């Protein structure tokens, strides 16, 4: 086995130990592509994979609107209550941070390993819930920006 395969197997094991089926499945799919000489698809997956993942995530979030489980009556309190306005602000801040996380992952793709291991530590020792690398990367980008800002003073 070469280093790429070894890294993917390690990520599969980390995903299984950390109860992160998405990491384990993603690494497994990439390992199968690599072992079946379908590596030619890697550049396309690398270039469009995040966009496709975000598309499916957005579709899943919008399903309650399409299935009419959420109506206008459910939406109006968002703009008239403290809880609703706080939820709107939280969603806006979270998506902004996710965008910063995406920028960080695009410029520093090797950071995914640290984010995955950190997520596993959070799951195992703090009973956290894995929500994906974007939020972890967003928080990391925010902390790095704070470090840069305070470090330059």
From Swiss-Prot:
UniProt keyword DNA damage, yes or no: no
Membrane topology, from the record: Multi-pass membrane protein
Keywords assigned by UniProt, alphabetized: Cell membrane, Membrane, Transmembrane, Transmembrane helix
Compartment(s) of residence: Cell membrane
Keyword Membrane: yes
Xref: Pfam families: DUF441
InterPro entries given in the database record: UPF0756_TM
TM spans (from-to): 6-26, 52-72, 77-97, 111-131, 132-152
A GO cellular component annotation in the UniProt record: plasma membrane
Homology family: Belongs to the UPF0756 family.
PANTHER family membership: UPF0756 MEMBRANE PROTEIN YEAL (PTHR38452:SF1)
Name under which the protein is recorded: UPF0756 membrane protein BBR47_23170
Species of provenance: Brevibacillus brevis (strain 47 / JCM 6285 / NBRC 100599)
Organism taxonomic ancestry: Bacteria, Bacillati, Bacillota, Bacilli, Bacillales
């Amino acid at each position: 086995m070469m280093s790429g395969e070894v890294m993917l197997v390690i990520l599969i094991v980390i995903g299984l130990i950390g109860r992160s089926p998405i990491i384990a499945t993603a690494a497994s799919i990439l390992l199968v592509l690599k072992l079946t000489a379908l590596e030619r698809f890697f550049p396309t997956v690398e270039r469009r994979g995040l966009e496709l993942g975000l598309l499916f995530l957005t579709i899943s979030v919008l399903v309650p609107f399409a299935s009419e489980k959420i109506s206008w009556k459910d939406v109006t309190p968002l703009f008239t209550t403290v809880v609703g306005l706080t939820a709107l602000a939280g969603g806006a801040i979270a998506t902004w941070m996710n965008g910063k996380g995406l920028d960080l992952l695009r410029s520093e793709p090797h950071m995914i390993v640290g984010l995955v291991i950190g997520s596993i530590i959070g799951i195992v020792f703090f009973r956290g819930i894995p929500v994906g690398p974007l939020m972890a990367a967003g928080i990391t980008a925010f902390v790095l920006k704070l470090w840069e800002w305070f470090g330059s003073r």
